A protein has these predicted regions:
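Short, Lys/Arg-enriched, Trp-marked, Pro/Gly-tolerant hinge/linker segments that flank
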Residues: 1-30, 34, 38, 44-49, ...
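Short secondary-structure transition/capping segments
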Residues: 2, 34, 91-92, 117-122
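Generic alpha-helical secondary structure signal
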Residues: 22-26, 78, 88, 115
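Terminal helix-turn-helix DNA-binding modules in bacterial transcription factors
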Residues: 30, 39, 43, 61-100, ...
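Short coil turns linking two alpha-helices in DNA-binding domains
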Residues: 52-53, 100-101
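Short hydrophobic/aromatic patch on the recognition helix
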Residues: 56, 60, 104-105, 109
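Helix-turn-helix/homeodomain-like alpha-helical modules used for DNA recognition
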Residues: 106-108, 112-113, 117-119, 123
């Protein structure tokens, strides 16, 4: 119960936390959070973890139940949540977290959070 409540309160994805038990994946997640603007490809992520593509995909799926692209999308959006809460405008956020367009960011945000960035901010107040 406590884990479920705290994960929903702080927008923590328990599946992503599971990757913390796998050191190479944990290091990758930290790297993505620190450098969300980098154009992380599947090859980049596999190389970062010193795994083959197939091993990397298998391990990240096992640890998180997500594909590498879903992990990347979720992490970028979680970084954007912190920026939004600090009052930074969406127009200033999207490129800093790796999106080429504002509409692409909006689509990804809605996919991960289930709502638009503005609606999300309104619900936090």
């Amino acid at each position: 119960y406590v884990v479920n409540e705290s994960t929903s309160l702080y927008n923590i994805d328990i599946n992503l936390l599971n990757a913390a038990n796998d050191e190479p994946l944990a290091k990758l997640i930290i790297a993505i959070i620190k450098n969300p603007q980098y154009s992380w490809s599947l090859d980049d992520m596999a190389r970062f973890t010193y795994m083959s593509r197939s091993t990397f995909i298998r391990r990240i799926l096992k640890a998180t139940s997500y594909t590498p692209n879903v992990v990347l999308r979720k992490l970028r959006i979680y970084v954007s949540l912190n920026l939004l809460r600090r009052g930074i405008k969406t127009e200033d956020i999207y490129s800093s977290i790796g999106y080429e367009s504002l509409s692409g960011f909006y689509q990804a945000f809605k996919r991960v959070m289930g709502t638009a960035p503005g609606d999300y901010l309104s619900s936090c107040k």
